[in-house]
Amino acid sequence: HDKNTATAFADTVRDLPRTPGRRTSVSSALEIGSLLIEASEKDIVATRKVIDVSGDGPNNDGNPMMETHDRIVAQGIIVNGLPIMDDNANGYYPDLDRYYAGCVVGGRGAFVVVVRKYADYAAGMRHKLILEISQNESLIKEASTAKKPLLTKIAAGPAAGPAAQPEVLRPTNGYPGGCDIQNGFGGFRRF
């Protein structure tokens, strides 16, 4: 697609209404992402399949997290994460980065980009996209030689926002409090 399509999509996402709530279903996001990838495979041959998960809370609704995670990763899908850890937010989780590393991300080359303030989200997303693209050398070469201006501009442009280099974590094996959180605002308890 072209720059106008990307800009229109970004505008649509930016203009979506925010709905504060106490429920987060990371497992449902993974399931929907997997279904969308599966549906697109009729028309597109992908060299990599990646689901990006951004959020400010753990899985406290929907199906069990690790069961869903393991099924998605077994399909060859990479899951990367961008936890938003703003300590001024309602329902702040001080170790959400470790939760994402232990329960959300997975697959070959998976990673977590940590954002510490909502204001730094755009910079974190940009950093994450560059990491995802740069993990595939042929894609970088194609972007620069095929004159795909949007990808080239993103990769070459200056850092957006104050957080130029967000913290990046690799996957770990589980989370001490469990990956399914009941009553997320009341504490980390297994279902």
Q: Can you say where each PLM-predicted feature lies in the sequence?
A:
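Von Willebrand factor A/integrin I-like adhesion domains
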Residues: 84-140
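VWA/integrin I-like adhesion module and closely mimicked acidic/polar interface patches used
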Residues: 57-102
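Von Willebrand factor
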Residues: 2-48, 81-96, 124
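DG-centered beta-turn motif at the end of beta-strands
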Residues: 33, 47-62, 104
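A cross-kingdom marker for long, charged
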Residues: 113, 124-191
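Sec-exported extracytoplasmic/periplasmic mature domains
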Residues: 14, 18, 34-42, 59, ...
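Active-site-proximal beta-strand/loop segments in catalytic clefts of secreted hydrolases
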Residues: 1, 54-57, 82-85, 115-118
